Swiss-Prot record:
Subcellular location: Nucleus
The name this protein goes by in its record: DNA replication complex GINS protein SLD5
The gene coding this protein: SLD5
Function: The GINS complex plays an essential role in the initiation of DNA replication. Has a role in chromosome segregation.
GO cellular component: GINS complex
Region (Disordered): 1-33
Protein's GO biological process: chromosome segregation; DNA-templated DNA replication; double-strand break repair via break-induced replication
Keyword Nucleus: yes
Biased composition (Acidic residues): 1-10
Native source species: Yarrowia lipolytica (strain CLIB 122 / E 150) (Yeast)
Upper classification of the organism: Eukaryota, Fungi, Dikarya, Ascomycota, Saccharomycotina
Length: 260
């Protein structure tokens, strides 16, 4: 996304997102709202929705579903998955549009209008979206922190990072090396100063645990069997399986199964 020149690192996620990111109406609402009440809330939100050149309402809702799916998948996967930088770019651009509209309506607000209620509903919905973005980014940064040496020595895995995440990795790694050197490593023999030494019985490079157990749901009835030792598991559509990530990863990548 370098051509769009969006500084994801400097974006203030606390500012909120586009009010169009709301769940579509359901016939049975868990909060006990009727269809008419849900439609009324949608109408209020529409009044605060700015003109958005980045997509239709359906496309915006699809972006939120994709973000939710990406967050769940990232949490379940022990490895760093390809970044959703383009998705975050679209959502964060809508943040800027929504901020302008909210500020304008807050300034022009009069006690005889329903603007206060409109803004309250929009801000409540924005909190949910902000939570998804923060959680998604925190999960990715946690993986980078836990396996810093591994990602530093793995150019292929670094391709899954955004430019901002690669900058974070390089800066954090440099700070950590400098701290260790000044605190204790300068007193060690040269043969013991390497932070990525894997010559001994225990490697200093902490790699992602590919045998981490994961929950998956089969979404395509392929009829394939997975052999695990003397046992086998058949991938039937709708079935839920707990299995090692290393065994199921190729089916996740092909879209036959999804994390839950």
């Amino acid at each position: 996304m370098e051509e769009d020149n969006l500084d994801l690192e400097g974006m203030d996620i606390h500012s909120g997102l586009d009010s169009s990111f709301h769940s579509p109406p359901h016939t049975s609402d868990p909060a006990g709202l009727s269809m008419d009440e849900t439609d009324d809330i949608d109408d209020l939100i529409n009044n605060v929705r700015p003109h958005d050149p980045l997509g239709t309402l359906e496309e915006k809702e699809a972006d939120i579903k994709e973000l939710t799916h990406s967050w769940v998948t990232e949490r379940m996967s022990p490895t760093l998955l390809p970044t959703k930088e383009a998705l975050l770019f679209r959502i964060l651009k809508r943040v800027q549009l929504q901020i302008e509209v909210i500020e304008e309506k807050s300034i022009d607000m009069s006690p005889d209008t329903d603007v206060k209620l409109e803004l309250l509903i929009v801000e409540t919905e924005l909190e949910r979206i902000k939570y998804l973005i923060r959680s998604y980014l925190r999960v990715r940064l946690l993986k980078i922190d836990n396996s810093m040496e591994y990602y530093q020595s793995s150019p292929l895995d670094r391709m899954n990072m955004s430019q901002t995440e690669r900058m974070y990795l390089n800066r954090h790694y440099a700070l950590l090396k400098n701290l260790y050197a000044h605190q204790f490593m300068n007193t060690f023999p040269d043969s013991l100063k390497q932070m990525n030494d894997s010559s001994g019985s225990a490697s200093m490079v902490q790699e992602p645990n590919m045998d981490h157990p994961v929950f998956v749901r089969v979404v395509k009835d392929t009829g394939r069997k997975i052999i695990i030792g003397n046992d086998s598991v058949k991938l039937r559509k709708g079935s839920i399986v707990v299995i090692k990530y290393s065994i199921i990863v190729k089916y996740v990548e092909s879209g036959d199964v999804v994390f839950i």
